[in-house]
Amino acid sequence: MSKGFVEGMRSLCDLHSKTGIDSSGEYLPSRTDRQVGLGILGLANLLRQNNITYEQFGEALQATNDGIPGLGTAGLLAAEFYKGIQSAADVAKEYDMERAFAIAPTASCSYRSKDREGFTCTPEIAPPIARSVDRDSGTFGVQTYEYGDVEIASEVGWDAYKKVADQLMYMFNHTGLLHGYSFNSWSDVVTYDEQFVEEWLESPQTSLYYSLQVMGDVQDKSSAYAALDEEDVQDYLQGILDPKPDCDCQE
């Protein structure tokens, strides 16, 4: 695991000066813009493969950040993450990078990536909403992607997910090379009140991105009848269609 962070960072840093991205005039040349963004893809897959829950991993990450040796497989994995992130930061500093880590929405990238068991990698570090997803593409039509028997958001819970996200951010931020994390909140689980804002400001998070609905029983807001039971909808529509016109056509 730690070796993967190092190899990934070295590949990014090597690529940085070869993209020619400044040729359009829209971006700074690589000699000026000393930034890359190494992130994480498929965390839910990795945890499943090692029989680790998000809750266990969050606790292990916190222990590692606190300098306490973690226990079991979760503790070993957390230690590998810490070692890998710190070692990758050393590589970035060799290349004089000013920023080197970022966790961003990676759905399109995840669709093109497989884990070591052949399942589609889940986007970034969050648990997915479901174990499979349909992607409707104008080019390829509807395609179904399977994540395998990973933990999904409704099973993980907000607190366990938030702890993993916070503790990973602490690890990245400790390097001094963090961009940030485009963090998706769960609108059907949390309440956006003063307490939420206060806890957010005290956390290591940098930005809120999408507001997602992750629970399986969330209403479909695309339907005007979403708040009604199906039977009520049918009765309502039938009541409109059934009555015969009550008028004197001669009038």
Question: Each predicted region: which residue ranges?
Answer:
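Long, C-terminal-biased catalytic regions of enzyme "large/alpha" subunits
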Residues: 1-251
